[in-house]
């Protein structure tokens, strides 16, 4: 988490890119909007999502509370968000009385185990995963009101996406002698659903409810491309880690 202090009262353009998921993953979404500071030295707080990994620690800004390590599984990309208070990762704003502290969110991409494609980060809705392995399960993208549904085989454990965090599924593996996780959904306003065996997880949704003149572009949108974080070009989705740019547009 980083603190940004707006030096002067005025209008600021906020831009966020979510992170890409792990392996054959969806790319991160993009959000932008205008925020007005009425005072000098006004603080904002930024969490930049971390790219999803393979068989490892959950990504920053996409960490389930009860998971410290994804055994035999893929991690979804973390969302990127800007808030008016310092509470850390987006999941800490889940209660209704804290959500108005969130200005903007860009959803992270879902991961994919084996073959297929994880869903891209939103957009208002994250995109569904697309598994191509026979029997592979599909995670749904997160929306503005709920987390994506996690797809699992009968008897597997399923945790759906939730506010700020992607879902996941798993089964106990006799061969590994521990839980075998599949693909985790991307983080977001609401996280994408995960998938168990050979599955593709959904992307997390984005949010622009705390800014004016906002727009959001999904990580797979080829008709309306995202700007690159350096502002020099355009792209179809954010690869790797997320990003954030804050630009002062005018002074009061």
Language model regions located:
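Contiguous ligand/interfacial binding patches
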Residues: 163, 194-239
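Secretome/extracellular-domain signature
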Residues: 26-137
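Acidic, glycine-rich loop-and-strand cores that form catalytic or ligand-binding grooves
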Residues: 101-103, 123-188, 192-194
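A short beta-strand element within beta-rich, extracytoplasmic domains
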Residues: 11-20, 46
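Surface-exposed ligand/attachment interfaces on beta-rich extracellular proteins
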Residues: 1-6, 167
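Extended extracellular/luminal ectodomain segments enriched in beta-structured repeat modules
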Residues: 6-13, 38-43
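Extracellular interaction modules
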Residues: 97-99, 234-243
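Short, structured beta-strand segments at or near domain termini in extracellular proteins/domains
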Residues: 105, 238-252
């Amino acid at each position: 988490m980083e603190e940004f202090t707006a030096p002067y009262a005025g209008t600021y353009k906020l831009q966020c890119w979510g992170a890409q998921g792990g392996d054959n993953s969806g790319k991160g979404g993009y959000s932008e909007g205008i925020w007005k500071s009425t005072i000098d030295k006004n603080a904002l707080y930024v969490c930049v999502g971390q790219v999803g990994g393979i068989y490892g620690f959950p990504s920053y800004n996409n960490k389930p509370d009860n998971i410290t390590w994804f055994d035999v599984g893929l991690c979804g990309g973390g969302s990127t968000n800007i808030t008016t208070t310092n509470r850390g990762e987006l999941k800490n704003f889940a209660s209704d009385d804290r959500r108005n502290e969130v200005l903007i969110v860009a959803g992270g991409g879902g991961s994919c185990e084996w073959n297929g494609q994880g869903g891209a980060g939103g957009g208002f809705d994250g995109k569904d995963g697309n598994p191509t392995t026979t029997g592979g399960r599909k995670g749904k993208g997160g929306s503005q009101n709920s987390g994506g549904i996690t797809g699992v085989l009968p008897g597997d454990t399923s945790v759906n996406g939730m506010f700020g965090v992607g879902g996941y599924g798993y089964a106990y593996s006799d061969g590994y002698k521990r839980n075998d996780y599949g693909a985790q959904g991307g983080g977001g306003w609401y996280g994408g659903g995960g998938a168990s065996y050979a599955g593709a997880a959904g992307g997390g949704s984005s949010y622009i409810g705390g800014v004016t003149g906002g727009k959001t572009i999904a990580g797979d949108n080829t008709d309306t491309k995202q700007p690159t974080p350096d502002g020099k070009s355009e792209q179809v989705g954010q690869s790797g880690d997320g990003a954030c740019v804050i630009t002062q547009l005018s002074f009061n």
